[in-house]
UniProtKB/Swiss-Prot annotation:
Organism ancestry: Bacteria, Bacillati, Bacillota, Clostridia, Halanaerobiales
Protein's recorded name: GTPase Der
Pfam families found in the cross-reference section: KH_dom-like, MMR_HSR1
InterPro entries: G_ENGA, GTP-bd, GTPase_Der, KH_dom-like, KH_dom-like_a/b, P-loop_NTPase, Small_GTP-bd
Quaternary structure (record): Associates with the 50S ribosomal subunit.
Segments forming domain EngA-type G: 4-169, 178-353
Family classification: Belongs to the TRAFAC class TrmE-Era-EngA-EngB-Septin-like GTPase superfamily. EngA (Der) GTPase family.
Gene that encodes the chain: der
Residues that bind GTP 2: 184-191, 231-235, 296-299
Keyword check for Cytoplasm: no
Domain KH-like residue range list: 354-438
Amino acid sequence: MAKPVVAIVGRPNVGKSTLFNRLAGYRISIVEGEPNVTRDRIYADVNWLDRSFIIVDTGGIDPYDRDQIKNMVKYQAQMAIDEASLILFVVDGRNGLTATDEEVAAFLRKSNKKVILVVNKVDDFKNMEEDCWEFYTLGFDKLIPISAEHGKNTGDLLDEIVNMLPEKGPEDSDDDAIDVAIIGKPNVGKSSLVNYIVGQERVIVSDIPGTTRDAIDTLVEKNGHRYNLIDTAGLRKKSRVKEATEYYSALRTIKAIDRSDGVIMMIDALEGVTEQDKKIAGYAHEAGKAIVLAVNKWDLVEKDTHTMENYKEEIYYNLKFLQYAPVTFISALTGKRVQELLKLIEYVVDQNSRRVKTGLLNEVVQESIQLREPPTRKGKKLKIFYTTQVGIKPPTFVFFVNNPGLVHFAYQRYLENSLRDAFGFVGSPIRLKFKQKT
């Protein structure tokens, strides 16, 4: 089951992005401090009271273009209605109710979606009734005053969000099928890949949308293995506004990634890695999913004996944070290497669930330390006492040390590479945590 989506909606300058950043500060799933992972997201994972959900910021409106503001606020409100389980409608308690607020509210009242009216920029909580009274005329039952900038009352807001989220459902109704998200920018060939696989194999369930808001799932069987292909292609609403289109496409993609076991990240061979590719791949990496990089339209590329290797180097240069992900070169149109791709995604999904025995793990770590001792920092030396694996999907390891502050990023990367050399983890991200031994 995909995580529920909570959309932040409102006119410009009411503090949507500030609220987004405040709520995103509670997330625990993002690995901080890793280089080359694009961070300019419009979405983030949040975990609060044992519930996980995705928050989305519907910002990006030019405040100087009045026509664009009017159209974009409407369009973003409509997208929130389509996509979200819950909507945070943000208004400005300092400046009061405006005609644009009423326009957005009119959209939201017509929907069947749950709405929390968030009155931001409340300075005096003792007299908050005076700051908020006029907003009750908008007709929403739930109203919460906050100061996103200072974090006041945001805990109460998170409590109410969790209270209003839909109940948890089963994680997966097809336990023996591998959920594979096929992601990539528009027109990279996602639908062509699904159509080729479906056309070649026996279709069990084809093109059945989970809901009108979800990606299309196609369940196929190949050589005794079942694959649930999650395709976001063809679902993106057409819009003349580029920013809104990218927002809609990104939200579809992250929902597909979130409920997958593994990800096929498709790259256009004729265009190479783009900035949009980096953003999409970055979320898959941060979400801890097994991943394969599939370079599509390879049949259209002029090749010599070095073309494939040179292309791999270029991909890893642009996606430095995905150097663990295998690269394969396919043609979704002709089917070249598509069967190999299916075997590869199954392999990396298995790698992402791999566990290592504690004794063997510590042998490898100690050998790595002997080969390259940790560098000293400010005259102090890092000591690693022992290591244990604490999780899978992705494989997560805790190193008990004398002082976590002495761990240099370069040495952390060295330890990760040592684990990969010893145990593989092909196509799987690895999480390393360092805790002080008590």
